[in-house]
Amino acid sequence: MNNKHPENKAKSTTTPKTIALNKRARHEYHLIERHEAGLELQGWEVKAIRAGRANLADGYAYVRDGEIFLIGAQITPLIQASTHVVANDRRTRKLLLHRRQIDTLIGRVQREGFTLVPTAMYWSKNRVKMEIALAKGKQAHDKRHAEKEREWQRDKQRIMRAHNRNA
C-alpha cells in the first residue's frame, strides 16, 4: 500500500490559530496599518498561552532605545508554574520585528503621533505572533457615530429580510 497520498495521512490535530483578540482596540482607535511581530516569551508564558490565558485588552506597545516593547498585556500563569521563578503576568515583553519595520514604526509614532496597539495574538507555525496596528485615538463623537452606523446597518438588514420574506 502506498502511504504517500494525502488521503492516507492521519489528520493533524492543530490548535485554533487565534489566541486572543483586542476588541477594545477597534472601538477606541482608528486602525491605520497592521504589522506582524514575534514575541519574546518565557517557557511558562507559552504554556499559559496554550491554555488560553492571554488578555490583550489593556496592552499597548512603546518604543525604547530603538526597540519596541509590549506592556500591559496579561498572560496569567498556570497553577502548576514553577515556584522558583516569579511569574509576573503583566511584565514588559519585547516585540520581534525586522530593523526596517522598527524604523518605520518609530518614525510614524514620533512624527505623526500614532499609537501602537496590539490587536490579535495567534499561532503561526508553532510560534506565537502578535498583530500590532498603527492607530489614532477616536474622539467620543467618533465612537457615537460608529455605533449609530452599526445600528443602522443592523436595522437595514432586518428591513431587507422582512421585505424579502413578504415578497
From Swiss-Prot:
Keyword rRNA-binding among record annotations: no
GO BP term, example: trans-translation
UniProt-annotated location(s): Cytoplasm
Cross-referenced InterPro entries: SmpB (IPR023620), SsrA-bd_prot (IPR000037), SsrA-bd_prot_CS (IPR020081)
Region of interest (Disordered), residue spans: 139-167
Biased composition (Basic and acidic residues): 144-158
Annotated Pfam families: SmpB
UniProt-listed PANTHER family: SSRA-BINDING PROTEIN (PTHR30308:SF2), TMRNA-BINDING COMPONENT OF TRANS-TRANSLATION TAGGING COMPLEX (PTHR30308)
Protein name in UniProt: SsrA-binding protein
